[in-house]
């Protein structure tokens, strides 16, 4: 199993949710986040003064999936979130040793 951590632009949230749903993902954790990287920060001018934010707003999804589904999910997310410009985001792929559904005690793929 894998844990996919997706970092995307807030404007792509609904498209990514639809892509995950179309890929058979029944649930995800979605967190508002901010970060910095190649995109740098944003600057705005207010009453003649420039204000600079060092971070950019992002949305983070966490999704558990079976190993065999990883490639198709990544491709669907890249198609949904990608613009080809700096700041599109990242996908982190982590080995997931186990999952436990609290309500039933199911483990592994059955708990996803």
Q: Positions of the model-derived regions?
A:
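Positively charged, small/polar-rich N-terminal and surface patches that mediate targeting and assembly
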Residues: 1-112
């Amino acid at each position: 199993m894998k844990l996919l951590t997706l970092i995307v632009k807030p404007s792509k949230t609904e498209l990514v949710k639809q892509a995950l749903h179309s890929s058979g993902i029944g649930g995800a954790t979605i967190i508002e986040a901010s970060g910095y990287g190649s995109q740098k920060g944003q600057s705005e001018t207010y009453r003649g003064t420039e204000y600079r934010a060092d971070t950019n707003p992002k949305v983070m999804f966490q999704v558990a999936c079976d190993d065999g589904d990883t490639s198709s999910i990544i491709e669907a997310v890249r198609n949904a979130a990608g613009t080809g410009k700096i700041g599109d985001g990242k996908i982190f792929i982590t080995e997931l040793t186990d999952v436990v559904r609290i309500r039933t005690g199911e483990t592994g793929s059955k708990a996803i």
